[in-house]
UniProtKB/Swiss-Prot annotation:
GO MF entry, a single one: medium-chain fatty acid-CoA ligase activity
Species of provenance: Beauveria bassiana (strain ARSEF 2860) (White muscardine disease fungus)
Principal location: other
Enzyme class: ligase
Source species taxonomy: Eukaryota, Fungi, Dikarya, Ascomycota, Pezizomycotina
Entry function: Acyl-CoA ligase; part of the gene cluster that mediates the biosynthesis of at least 11 siderophores, including beauverichelin A, dimerumic acid (DA), Na-dimethyl coprogen (NADC), eleutherazine B, ferricrocin (FC), fusarinine A, fusarinine C (FsC), metachelin A, mevalonolactone, rhodotorulic acid (RA) and tenellin. This cocktail of siderophores for iron metabolism is essential for virulence, and more specifically for the fungal virulence in penetrating through the host cuticle. Siderophore synthesis is also involved in conidial germination under iron-deficient conditions.
Intracellular or extracellular location(s): Peroxisome
One BP term from GO: fatty acid metabolic process
SS bond list: none
Record keywords: ATP-binding, Ligase, Nucleotide-binding, Peroxisome, Virulence
Name of the protein this chain belongs to: Acyl-CoA ligase sidI
PROSITE patterns in alphabetical order: AMP_BINDING (PS00455)
Length: 576
Protein backbone atom coordinates (compact mmCIF):
# COMPACT_ATOMS: atom_id res chain seq x y z
CA UNK A 1 0.00 0.00 0.00
CA UNK A 2 1.54 3.30 -1.08
CA UNK A 3 0.98 6.02 1.51
CA UNK A 4 -0.09 9.50 0.50
CA UNK A 5 2.86 11.86 0.76
CA UNK A 6 2.50 15.33 2.22
CA UNK A 7 4.33 18.46 1.20
CA UNK A 8 5.89 20.70 3.79
CA UNK A 9 4.78 23.81 1.89
CA UNK A 10 3.21 26.32 4.25
CA UNK A 11 -0.26 27.19 2.95
CA UNK A 12 -0.35 30.64 1.46
CA UNK A 13 -1.25 33.21 4.08
CA UNK A 14 -4.00 35.53 2.84
CA UNK A 15 -3.78 39.30 3.16
CA UNK A 16 -4.45 40.54 6.71
CA UNK A 17 -7.50 42.47 5.60
CA UNK A 18 -9.35 39.34 4.43
CA UNK A 19 -9.71 37.80 7.91
CA UNK A 20 -10.20 34.37 6.45
CA UNK A 21 -10.58 31.19 8.49
CA UNK A 22 -7.03 29.92 7.93
CA UNK A 23 -4.81 29.03 10.90
CA UNK A 24 -1.23 27.83 11.42
CA UNK A 25 -0.16 26.17 14.66
CA UNK A 26 2.96 27.13 16.66
CA UNK A 27 6.32 25.98 15.29
CA UNK A 28 7.65 25.21 18.78
CA UNK A 29 8.44 22.71 20.10
CA UNK A 30 10.04 21.24 16.97
CA UNK A 31 8.95 17.92 15.53
CA UNK A 32 11.10 14.90 16.43
CA UNK A 33 12.01 11.97 14.20
CA UNK A 34 11.68 8.94 16.47
CA UNK A 35 10.12 5.54 16.05
CA UNK A 36 7.88 4.32 18.86
CA UNK A 37 10.53 1.74 19.74
CA UNK A 38 13.15 4.47 20.05
CA UNK A 39 10.75 6.55 22.14
CA UNK A 40 10.24 3.75 24.65
CA UNK A 41 13.97 2.99 24.82
CA UNK A 42 14.69 6.68 25.46
CA UNK A 43 12.04 7.03 28.17
CA UNK A 44 13.19 3.79 29.78
CA UNK A 45 16.72 5.19 29.95
CA UNK A 46 15.39 8.30 31.70
CA UNK A 47 12.60 6.81 33.85
CA UNK A 48 13.38 3.08 33.99
CA UNK A 49 12.37 2.34 37.60
CA UNK A 50 9.41 4.73 37.55
CA UNK A 51 5.98 3.07 37.37
CA UNK A 52 4.53 3.44 33.89
CA UNK A 53 1.49 1.18 33.64
CA UNK A 54 -0.96 0.16 36.36
CA UNK A 55 -3.82 -2.27 35.72
CA UNK A 56 -5.79 -2.70 38.98
CA UNK A 57 -8.02 -5.47 37.64
CA UNK A 58 -5.05 -7.73 36.77
CA UNK A 59 -2.76 -6.50 39.55
CA UNK A 60 -0.04 -5.44 37.09
CA UNK A 61 2.27 -2.59 38.07
CA UNK A 62 4.86 -2.23 35.32
CA UNK A 63 7.78 0.16 35.39
CA UNK A 64 9.25 1.59 32.20
CA UNK A 65 11.88 -1.16 32.47
CA UNK A 66 9.12 -3.78 32.61
CA UNK A 67 7.21 -2.44 29.60
CA UNK A 68 10.39 -2.12 27.56
CA UNK A 69 11.59 -5.62 28.49
CA UNK A 70 8.22 -7.30 27.89
CA UNK A 71 7.80 -5.61 24.51
CA UNK A 72 11.37 -6.53 23.50
CA UNK A 73 10.86 -10.20 24.39
CA UNK A 74 7.57 -10.23 22.52
CA UNK A 75 9.13 -8.45 19.52
CA UNK A 76 11.85 -11.11 19.43
CA UNK A 77 9.19 -13.84 19.50
CA UNK A 78 7.31 -12.17 16.63
CA UNK A 79 10.52 -12.10 14.59
CA UNK A 80 10.90 -15.83 15.26
CA UNK A 81 7.36 -16.28 13.87
CA UNK A 82 8.46 -14.58 10.66
CA UNK A 83 6.80 -11.23 11.33
CA UNK A 84 8.71 -8.30 9.85
CA UNK A 85 8.44 -4.80 8.43
CA UNK A 86 4.99 -4.07 7.07
CA UNK A 87 3.38 -7.30 8.29
CA UNK A 88 0.06 -6.87 10.06
CA UNK A 89 -0.50 -7.96 13.64
CA UNK A 90 -4.08 -7.78 14.93
CA UNK A 91 -5.32 -7.26 18.46
CA UNK A 92 -8.81 -7.46 19.92
CA UNK A 93 -8.74 -7.18 23.69
CA UNK A 94 -9.72 -5.10 26.68
CA UNK A 95 -7.44 -2.67 28.48
CA UNK A 96 -4.56 -4.67 29.96
CA UNK A 97 -0.78 -4.59 30.31
CA UNK A 98 -0.29 -7.11 27.49
CA UNK A 99 -2.04 -4.75 25.06
CA UNK A 100 0.64 -2.12 25.61
CA UNK A 101 3.39 -4.73 25.18
CA UNK A 102 1.90 -5.95 21.88
CA UNK A 103 1.68 -2.37 20.60
CA UNK A 104 5.32 -1.55 21.30
CA UNK A 105 6.53 -5.00 20.21
CA UNK A 106 4.96 -4.61 16.77
CA UNK A 107 6.33 -1.07 16.53
CA UNK A 108 9.88 -2.13 17.39
CA UNK A 109 10.13 -4.52 14.43
CA UNK A 110 8.30 -2.35 11.90
CA UNK A 111 5.10 -4.39 11.90
CA UNK A 112 1.71 -2.70 11.66
CA UNK A 113 -0.65 -3.16 14.59
CA UNK A 114 -4.25 -3.58 13.42
CA UNK A 115 -6.50 -2.47 16.23
CA UNK A 116 -9.91 -4.15 16.32
CA UNK A 117 -12.83 -2.58 18.15
CA UNK A 118 -14.08 -4.62 21.12
CA UNK A 119 -17.68 -3.91 20.14
CA UNK A 120 -17.28 -5.59 16.75
CA UNK A 121 -19.49 -8.53 15.93
CA UNK A 122 -17.62 -11.66 14.76
CA UNK A 123 -18.49 -10.67 11.18
CA UNK A 124 -17.04 -7.17 11.61
CA UNK A 125 -13.91 -8.49 13.31
CA UNK A 126 -13.37 -11.05 10.55
CA UNK A 127 -13.74 -8.29 7.98
CA UNK A 128 -11.00 -6.26 9.67
CA UNK A 129 -8.67 -9.25 10.07
CA UNK A 130 -9.08 -10.44 6.48
CA UNK A 131 -9.13 -6.97 4.92
CA UNK A 132 -5.78 -6.12 6.53
CA UNK A 133 -4.42 -9.68 6.06
CA UNK A 134 -3.24 -10.13 9.64
CA UNK A 135 -0.61 -12.83 10.15
CA UNK A 136 -1.06 -12.95 13.92
CA UNK A 137 -4.06 -11.99 16.07
CA UNK A 138 -3.85 -11.44 19.83
CA UNK A 139 -7.10 -11.80 21.73
CA UNK A 140 -8.87 -13.38 24.71
CA UNK A 141 -11.80 -15.78 25.01
CA UNK A 142 -13.86 -13.07 26.69
CA UNK A 143 -13.66 -9.29 26.68
CA UNK A 144 -15.72 -8.03 29.57
CA UNK A 145 -19.08 -9.74 29.08
CA UNK A 146 -18.50 -10.39 25.40
CA UNK A 147 -17.85 -14.00 24.41
CA UNK A 148 -15.28 -14.43 21.64
CA UNK A 149 -16.06 -18.10 20.99
CA UNK A 150 -17.73 -17.57 17.62
CA UNK A 151 -14.91 -15.39 16.30
CA UNK A 152 -12.33 -17.94 17.39
CA UNK A 153 -14.31 -20.66 15.64
CA UNK A 154 -14.51 -18.59 12.46
CA UNK A 155 -10.74 -18.04 12.56
CA UNK A 156 -10.13 -21.75 13.08
CA UNK A 157 -12.19 -22.52 9.98
CA UNK A 158 -10.04 -20.37 7.70
CA UNK A 159 -7.76 -22.36 5.40
CA UNK A 160 -4.90 -19.89 5.73
CA UNK A 161 -5.92 -17.85 8.74
CA UNK A 162 -3.71 -15.90 11.13
CA UNK A 163 -1.95 -17.45 14.10
CA UNK A 164 -4.12 -16.81 17.17
CA UNK A 165 -2.38 -15.94 20.44
CA UNK A 166 -4.24 -15.77 23.77
CA UNK A 167 -3.20 -12.82 25.89
CA UNK A 168 -4.39 -14.49 29.12
CA UNK A 169 -7.02 -16.83 30.50
CA UNK A 170 -8.00 -20.22 29.13
CA UNK A 171 -5.87 -21.02 26.10
CA UNK A 172 -6.98 -24.53 24.99
CA UNK A 173 -4.82 -25.36 21.96
CA UNK A 174 -3.80 -21.79 21.19
CA UNK A 175 -0.38 -20.25 21.73
CA UNK A 176 -0.27 -17.81 24.62
CA UNK A 177 1.38 -14.49 25.36
CA UNK A 178 3.37 -16.15 28.15
CA UNK A 179 4.55 -18.86 25.73
CA UNK A 180 5.96 -16.22 23.40
CA UNK A 181 7.64 -14.34 26.24
CA UNK A 182 9.26 -17.52 27.57
CA UNK A 183 10.47 -18.47 24.10
CA UNK A 184 12.44 -15.23 23.85
CA UNK A 185 13.79 -14.93 27.39
CA UNK A 186 17.53 -15.38 27.62
CA UNK A 187 18.12 -14.88 23.91
CA UNK A 188 20.46 -12.25 22.53
CA UNK A 189 18.76 -9.01 21.52
CA UNK A 190 21.07 -8.55 18.53
CA UNK A 191 18.43 -9.87 16.13
CA UNK A 192 15.91 -7.41 17.58
CA UNK A 193 18.29 -4.45 17.43
CA UNK A 194 19.06 -5.26 13.81
CA UNK A 195 15.32 -5.26 13.05
CA UNK A 196 14.81 -1.97 14.91
CA UNK A 197 17.49 -0.30 12.80
CA UNK A 198 15.40 -1.04 9.69
CA UNK A 199 12.37 0.87 11.00
CA UNK A 200 11.77 4.45 9.85
CA UNK A 201 9.68 7.05 11.73
CA UNK A 202 7.67 7.66 8.56
CA UNK A 203 6.58 4.04 8.15
CA UNK A 204 3.01 3.05 8.95
CA UNK A 205 2.77 1.51 12.43
CA UNK A 206 -0.94 1.40 13.13
CA UNK A 207 -4.20 0.72 11.31
CA UNK A 208 -7.12 2.33 13.10
CA UNK A 209 -10.55 1.43 11.78
CA UNK A 210 -12.66 4.56 11.75
CA UNK A 211 -16.04 4.12 13.35
CA UNK A 212 -17.77 6.40 10.90
CA UNK A 213 -21.51 6.99 11.06
CA UNK A 214 -21.98 5.80 7.47
CA UNK A 215 -20.74 2.83 5.46
CA UNK A 216 -18.08 0.19 6.11
CA UNK A 217 -15.21 1.14 8.43
CA UNK A 218 -12.06 2.43 6.75
CA UNK A 219 -8.58 1.71 8.08
CA UNK A 220 -6.55 4.88 8.67
CA UNK A 221 -2.80 4.36 8.25
CA UNK A 222 -0.89 6.16 11.01
CA UNK A 223 2.90 6.45 11.19
CA UNK A 224 5.39 6.50 14.06
CA UNK A 225 5.98 10.18 13.24
CA UNK A 226 2.26 10.92 13.49
CA UNK A 227 1.79 9.27 16.86
CA UNK A 228 5.02 10.23 18.62
CA UNK A 229 4.62 13.93 17.87
CA UNK A 230 0.88 14.21 18.38
CA UNK A 231 1.08 12.52 21.78
CA UNK A 232 3.94 14.85 22.81
CA UNK A 233 1.88 17.91 22.01
CA UNK A 234 -1.20 16.53 23.79
CA UNK A 235 0.79 16.00 26.98
CA UNK A 236 2.29 19.47 26.67
CA UNK A 237 -1.17 21.07 26.50
CA UNK A 238 -2.11 19.24 29.71
CA UNK A 239 1.21 20.25 31.33
CA UNK A 240 2.00 16.60 32.06
CA UNK A 241 5.20 15.71 33.90
CA UNK A 242 6.72 12.52 35.28
CA UNK A 243 4.80 13.21 38.51
CA UNK A 244 1.41 12.87 36.83
CA UNK A 245 -0.88 9.85 37.19
CA UNK A 246 -3.55 9.57 34.50
CA UNK A 247 -6.69 7.48 35.01
CA UNK A 248 -7.76 6.36 31.55
CA UNK A 249 -11.11 4.55 31.21
CA UNK A 250 -11.31 4.99 27.38
CA UNK A 251 -10.32 1.85 25.46
CA UNK A 252 -6.90 1.20 24.00
CA UNK A 253 -8.60 0.27 20.73
CA UNK A 254 -9.41 3.96 20.28
CA UNK A 255 -6.99 6.84 19.76
CA UNK A 256 -8.34 8.36 22.98
CA UNK A 257 -7.01 5.52 25.11
CA UNK A 258 -3.91 4.83 23.04
CA UNK A 259 -2.57 8.22 21.93
CA UNK A 260 -4.14 10.72 24.35
CA UNK A 261 -3.67 8.14 27.08
CA UNK A 262 -0.74 5.72 26.87
CA UNK A 263 1.51 7.64 24.48
CA UNK A 264 0.89 11.08 26.02
CA UNK A 265 2.01 9.60 29.34
CA UNK A 266 5.02 7.73 27.93
CA UNK A 267 6.29 10.85 26.13
CA UNK A 268 6.26 12.67 29.47
CA UNK A 269 7.53 9.92 31.76
CA UNK A 270 4.34 9.68 33.82
CA UNK A 271 2.09 6.85 34.97
CA UNK A 272 -1.17 5.63 33.43
CA UNK A 273 -3.89 3.62 35.13
CA UNK A 274 -6.43 1.58 33.13
CA UNK A 275 -9.08 0.82 35.78
CA UNK A 276 -10.85 -2.13 34.14
CA UNK A 277 -10.95 -4.36 31.08
CA UNK A 278 -13.92 -2.39 29.78
CA UNK A 279 -15.47 0.76 31.23
CA UNK A 280 -16.55 0.17 34.81
CA UNK A 281 -17.91 3.01 36.94
CA UNK A 282 -16.94 1.64 40.35
CA UNK A 283 -13.47 0.56 39.19
CA UNK A 284 -12.81 3.99 37.70
CA UNK A 285 -13.79 5.80 40.90
CA UNK A 286 -11.63 3.43 42.96
CA UNK A 287 -8.66 3.97 40.64
CA UNK A 288 -8.95 7.76 40.84
CA UNK A 289 -8.88 7.56 44.62
CA UNK A 290 -6.53 4.62 45.28
CA UNK A 291 -3.87 5.69 42.78
CA UNK A 292 -3.97 9.39 43.73
CA UNK A 293 -4.59 10.35 40.12
CA UNK A 294 -3.83 13.84 38.90
CA UNK A 295 -5.73 13.50 35.63
CA UNK A 296 -8.64 11.56 34.16
CA UNK A 297 -9.80 11.15 30.56
CA UNK A 298 -13.25 10.29 29.29
CA UNK A 299 -15.98 10.78 26.75
CA UNK A 300 -19.01 12.74 27.99
CA UNK A 301 -21.07 9.59 28.61
CA UNK A 302 -18.34 8.20 30.88
CA UNK A 303 -18.14 11.33 33.02
CA UNK A 304 -21.93 11.54 33.16
CA UNK A 305 -22.04 7.96 34.49
CA UNK A 306 -19.37 8.72 37.09
CA UNK A 307 -21.20 11.78 38.39
CA UNK A 308 -24.51 9.93 38.62
CA UNK A 309 -22.93 7.13 40.66
CA UNK A 310 -22.49 7.01 44.41
CA UNK A 311 -18.86 7.71 45.28
CA UNK A 312 -17.18 5.00 47.39
CA UNK A 313 -16.47 5.52 51.07
CA UNK A 314 -13.33 7.55 51.73
CA UNK A 315 -13.19 8.61 48.07
CA UNK A 316 -10.44 11.15 47.46
CA UNK A 317 -9.68 13.17 44.37
CA UNK A 318 -7.78 16.09 45.87
CA UNK A 319 -4.85 15.61 43.47
CA UNK A 320 -7.03 15.70 40.34
CA UNK A 321 -6.31 18.78 38.27
CA UNK A 322 -6.60 17.98 34.58
CA UNK A 323 -7.79 15.57 31.92
CA UNK A 324 -9.49 15.62 28.55
CA UNK A 325 -13.20 15.36 27.86
CA UNK A 326 -13.82 14.76 24.16
CA UNK A 327 -15.27 12.39 21.59
CA UNK A 328 -18.74 13.93 21.41
CA UNK A 329 -20.39 17.31 22.08
CA UNK A 330 -19.99 18.18 25.77
CA UNK A 331 -22.94 19.74 27.65
CA UNK A 332 -22.04 22.74 29.76
CA UNK A 333 -23.38 21.17 32.97
CA UNK A 334 -20.96 18.25 32.56
CA UNK A 335 -17.93 20.50 32.26
CA UNK A 336 -19.06 22.41 35.34
CA UNK A 337 -19.28 19.13 37.27
CA UNK A 338 -15.66 18.34 36.36
CA UNK A 339 -14.67 21.37 38.39
CA UNK A 340 -17.30 21.13 41.13
CA UNK A 341 -17.13 17.39 41.89
CA UNK A 342 -13.64 16.38 40.74
CA UNK A 343 -11.79 19.66 41.23
CA UNK A 344 -10.45 19.45 37.68
CA UNK A 345 -9.82 23.17 37.34
CA UNK A 346 -7.30 22.49 34.56
CA UNK A 347 -9.46 20.13 32.45
CA UNK A 348 -9.03 20.66 28.73
CA UNK A 349 -11.46 20.42 25.87
CA UNK A 350 -10.17 18.80 22.71
CA UNK A 351 -11.00 17.99 19.11
CA UNK A 352 -9.49 15.38 16.86
CA UNK A 353 -10.20 12.54 14.49
CA UNK A 354 -8.51 9.24 13.76
CA UNK A 355 -7.24 10.38 10.37
CA UNK A 356 -5.30 13.22 12.06
CA UNK A 357 -3.52 11.03 14.64
CA UNK A 358 -5.85 12.32 16.30
CA UNK A 359 -5.71 15.71 18.08
CA UNK A 360 -5.96 18.91 16.05
CA UNK A 361 -7.22 21.47 18.59
CA UNK A 362 -6.78 21.43 22.36
CA UNK A 363 -7.36 24.00 25.06
CA UNK A 364 -4.61 25.09 27.43
CA UNK A 365 -5.04 24.40 31.14
CA UNK A 366 -4.96 28.13 31.86
CA UNK A 367 -7.54 29.13 29.27
CA UNK A 368 -10.55 30.68 30.96
CA UNK A 369 -13.25 28.26 32.10
CA UNK A 370 -15.68 29.90 29.70
CA UNK A 371 -13.27 29.38 26.80
CA UNK A 372 -12.91 25.71 27.69
CA UNK A 373 -16.69 25.43 28.00
CA UNK A 374 -17.43 26.92 24.60
CA UNK A 375 -14.47 25.95 22.38
CA UNK A 376 -12.06 23.07 21.72
CA UNK A 377 -9.09 25.39 22.15
CA UNK A 378 -6.48 26.46 19.65
CA UNK A 379 -4.54 24.69 16.92
CA UNK A 380 -1.83 22.22 17.92
CA UNK A 381 1.84 22.78 16.94
CA UNK A 382 2.84 22.24 13.30
CA UNK A 383 -0.78 21.85 12.18
CA UNK A 384 -2.75 23.91 9.69
CA UNK A 385 -6.51 24.39 9.64
CA UNK A 386 -9.06 26.11 7.46
CA UNK A 387 -12.82 26.32 7.18
CA UNK A 388 -14.41 26.09 3.76
CA UNK A 389 -17.87 26.36 2.25
CA UNK A 390 -19.50 23.73 0.04
CA UNK A 391 -17.57 25.04 -2.95
CA UNK A 392 -14.22 24.69 -1.16
CA UNK A 393 -13.70 28.43 -0.62
CA UNK A 394 -12.20 29.59 2.68
CA UNK A 395 -14.89 31.43 4.65
CA UNK A 396 -14.39 34.59 6.74
CA UNK A 397 -13.67 34.29 10.46
CA UNK A 398 -16.93 33.81 12.34
CA UNK A 399 -18.64 31.92 9.52
CA UNK A 400 -19.40 28.21 9.81
CA UNK A 401 -18.17 25.69 7.30
CA UNK A 402 -16.32 22.41 6.95
CA UNK A 403 -13.13 22.07 8.98
CA UNK A 404 -10.04 20.94 7.04
CA UNK A 405 -6.70 19.96 8.60
CA UNK A 406 -3.19 19.94 7.14
CA UNK A 407 0.31 19.22 8.42
CA UNK A 408 2.59 16.44 9.71
CA UNK A 409 -0.22 14.59 11.48
CA UNK A 410 -2.29 13.54 8.49
CA UNK A 411 -2.80 9.84 7.96
CA UNK A 412 -0.85 8.17 5.17
CA UNK A 413 -4.21 7.33 3.62
CA UNK A 414 -6.82 4.60 4.00
CA UNK A 415 -5.52 1.05 3.74
CA UNK A 416 -6.27 -0.37 0.28
CA UNK A 417 -8.86 2.29 -0.41
CA UNK A 418 -7.44 4.90 -2.76
CA UNK A 419 -10.91 6.11 -3.76
CA UNK A 420 -11.89 7.07 -0.21
CA UNK A 421 -8.43 8.51 0.40
CA UNK A 422 -8.79 10.79 -2.63
CA UNK A 423 -12.26 11.77 -1.48
CA UNK A 424 -11.17 13.19 1.88
CA UNK A 425 -7.52 14.14 1.23
CA UNK A 426 -7.38 16.89 -1.37
CA UNK A 427 -4.51 19.13 -2.50
CA UNK A 428 -5.19 22.83 -2.93
CA UNK A 429 -3.88 25.03 -5.74
CA UNK A 430 -0.51 25.42 -3.97
CA UNK A 431 -0.04 21.65 -3.61
CA UNK A 432 -0.81 21.47 0.11
CA UNK A 433 -2.67 18.37 1.22
CA UNK A 434 -5.83 18.91 3.28
CA UNK A 435 -7.95 16.42 5.16
CA UNK A 436 -11.66 17.21 4.89
CA UNK A 437 -12.98 16.24 8.32
CA UNK A 438 -16.70 16.32 7.59
CA UNK A 439 -17.12 18.34 10.79
CA UNK A 440 -18.67 21.77 10.86
CA UNK A 441 -16.77 24.42 12.79
CA UNK A 442 -16.18 28.13 13.25
CA UNK A 443 -13.05 30.11 14.25
CA UNK A 444 -13.06 33.29 16.30
CA UNK A 445 -10.62 36.18 15.85
CA UNK A 446 -8.24 34.74 18.45
CA UNK A 447 -7.93 31.37 16.72
CA UNK A 448 -10.21 29.42 19.02
CA UNK A 449 -12.32 26.76 17.34
CA UNK A 450 -15.88 25.71 18.12
CA UNK A 451 -17.30 22.50 16.64
CA UNK A 452 -20.90 23.17 15.66
CA UNK A 453 -21.93 19.78 14.28
CA UNK A 454 -21.34 17.40 11.41
CA UNK A 455 -21.09 19.22 8.08
CA UNK A 456 -23.32 16.55 6.55
CA UNK A 457 -25.74 16.69 9.51
CA UNK A 458 -26.88 20.18 8.58
CA UNK A 459 -30.64 20.26 8.11
CA UNK A 460 -31.68 22.29 5.09
CA UNK A 461 -35.29 23.40 5.64
CA UNK A 462 -36.73 25.35 2.77
CA UNK A 463 -33.26 26.54 1.78
CA UNK A 464 -32.24 27.57 5.32
CA UNK A 465 -29.34 25.84 7.09
CA UNK A 466 -30.25 24.54 10.54
CA UNK A 467 -27.57 23.25 12.92
CA UNK A 468 -28.68 20.28 15.06
CA UNK A 469 -26.25 20.90 17.92
CA UNK A 470 -27.77 24.21 19.00
CA UNK A 471 -31.25 22.64 19.08
CA UNK A 472 -29.93 19.66 21.06
CA UNK A 473 -28.31 22.01 23.58
CA UNK A 474 -31.53 23.97 23.97
CA UNK A 475 -33.60 20.82 24.50
CA UNK A 476 -31.08 19.50 27.03
CA UNK A 477 -31.49 22.70 29.02
CA UNK A 478 -35.09 21.63 29.74
CA UNK A 479 -35.23 19.98 33.19
CA UNK A 480 -37.31 17.05 31.91
CA UNK A 481 -34.87 16.07 29.13
CA UNK A 482 -31.74 13.98 29.72
CA UNK A 483 -30.91 13.23 26.09
CA UNK A 484 -31.70 14.89 22.76
CA UNK A 485 -30.80 13.76 19.26
CA UNK A 486 -31.81 16.09 16.45
CA UNK A 487 -31.93 14.95 12.82
CA UNK A 488 -33.37 16.06 9.52
CA UNK A 489 -36.54 14.27 8.43
CA UNK A 490 -37.96 14.22 4.93
CA UNK A 491 -40.67 16.73 4.08
CA UNK A 492 -42.51 17.10 0.78
CA UNK A 493 -42.94 20.81 1.39
CA UNK A 494 -39.64 21.92 2.96
CA UNK A 495 -37.33 19.16 1.79
CA UNK A 496 -36.31 18.56 5.40
CA UNK A 497 -37.73 19.48 8.80
CA UNK A 498 -36.39 19.14 12.32
CA UNK A 499 -36.99 15.88 14.17
CA UNK A 500 -35.97 15.22 17.76
CA UNK A 501 -35.53 11.95 19.66
CA UNK A 502 -35.76 12.58 23.39
CA UNK A 503 -35.10 10.75 26.63
CA UNK A 504 -36.97 11.74 29.75
CA UNK A 505 -34.86 12.67 32.76
CA UNK A 506 -35.26 10.24 35.70
CA UNK A 507 -36.02 13.20 37.96
CA UNK A 508 -38.85 14.52 35.78
CA UNK A 509 -42.24 14.26 37.49
CA UNK A 510 -44.05 14.14 34.16
CA UNK A 511 -43.30 14.14 30.47
CA UNK A 512 -43.62 17.60 28.89
CA UNK A 513 -46.03 18.00 26.01
CA UNK A 514 -44.78 18.41 22.47
CA UNK A 515 -46.10 21.95 22.39
CA UNK A 516 -44.30 22.83 25.62
CA UNK A 517 -41.02 21.67 24.10
CA UNK A 518 -41.60 23.52 20.85
CA UNK A 519 -42.29 26.70 22.79
CA UNK A 520 -39.15 26.03 24.84
CA UNK A 521 -37.04 25.91 21.68
CA UNK A 522 -38.76 28.98 20.19
CA UNK A 523 -37.90 31.09 23.24
CA UNK A 524 -34.22 30.98 22.28
CA UNK A 525 -34.13 29.87 18.65
CA UNK A 526 -36.12 30.68 15.55
CA UNK A 527 -39.49 29.07 14.94
CA UNK A 528 -38.12 27.15 11.96
CA UNK A 529 -35.72 25.41 14.38
CA UNK A 530 -38.54 24.14 16.56
CA UNK A 531 -38.98 20.35 16.11
CA UNK A 532 -41.73 19.42 13.70
CA UNK A 533 -41.67 15.84 14.98
CA UNK A 534 -40.90 14.63 18.49
CA UNK A 535 -40.20 11.02 19.47
CA UNK A 536 -39.52 9.56 22.91
CA UNK A 537 -36.93 6.81 23.27
CA UNK A 538 -38.58 3.60 24.41
CA UNK A 539 -42.09 4.73 23.46
CA UNK A 540 -44.37 4.55 20.41
CA UNK A 541 -42.30 2.07 18.47
CA UNK A 542 -39.03 3.89 19.17
CA UNK A 543 -36.28 1.64 20.63
CA UNK A 544 -34.90 2.67 24.02
CA UNK A 545 -31.33 2.12 22.82
CA UNK A 546 -29.65 4.51 20.41
CA UNK A 547 -27.41 3.09 17.64
CA UNK A 548 -23.81 4.07 18.34
CA UNK A 549 -20.49 3.73 16.57
CA UNK A 550 -17.67 1.91 18.35
CA UNK A 551 -16.38 5.22 19.70
CA UNK A 552 -19.75 6.21 21.14
CA UNK A 553 -21.02 8.59 18.46
CA UNK A 554 -24.69 8.49 17.56
CA UNK A 555 -25.40 7.03 14.13
CA UNK A 556 -27.61 9.91 13.12
CA UNK A 557 -28.30 8.55 9.66
CA UNK A 558 -29.95 5.53 11.31
CA UNK A 559 -31.99 7.77 13.61
CA UNK A 560 -33.15 9.82 10.62
CA UNK A 561 -34.06 6.64 8.78
CA UNK A 562 -36.07 5.46 11.80
CA UNK A 563 -37.89 8.78 12.01
CA UNK A 564 -38.78 8.69 8.32
CA UNK A 565 -40.08 5.12 8.69
CA UNK A 566 -42.21 6.04 11.71
CA UNK A 567 -43.73 8.93 9.81
CA UNK A 568 -44.42 6.75 6.78
CA UNK A 569 -46.26 4.28 9.00
CA UNK A 570 -48.25 7.24 10.31
CA UNK A 571 -47.30 6.53 13.88
CA UNK A 572 -49.28 9.04 15.97
CA UNK A 573 -46.87 11.88 16.57
CA UNK A 574 -47.55 15.56 17.04
CA UNK A 575 -46.97 17.64 13.94
CA UNK A 576 -46.25 21.30 13.60
Amino acid sequence: MTPVTTKTIRPEVPPETEKLSLLHGPIDPPLVDLTLGELLELQTYQHGTHECLVIPWTGARWTYNDLNQQSSWLAHALLDLGIGVGDRVGIMAGNCEQYAAVFFAAAKIGAILVILNNTYTPTEAMYGIQFSECKVVFTTRKIGRMDNTRLLGDLDNLDRGPKVVMLRGESANYATYDDLIESAMGKSHEKLYEAMRRVSPHQVVNLQFTSGTTGLPKAAMLTHHNLVNNSRFIGDRMRLTSADVLCCPPPLFHCFGLVLGLLAIVTHGGKIVYPAEVFDIAATLRAISDENCTAVHGVPAMFDSLFQAEFPANFRCDRLRTGIIAGAPVPRYLMELLVEKFGMTEFTSSYGLTEASPTCFNAFTDDSIDTRLTTVGTLMPHAHAKIVDRDGNIVPVGVRGELCIGGYQLQAGYWNNSAKTAEVMVRDATGVLWLHTGDEAVFDEHGYCSITGRFKDIIIRGGENIYPLEIEERLLAHPAISRAIVVGLKSNHYGEVVGAFLERAPTAAKKPSDQELRDWVRKRLGGHKSPAHLFWLGEGGVPADVPLTGSGKVKKFEMAKLGDELLRKETPVAKL
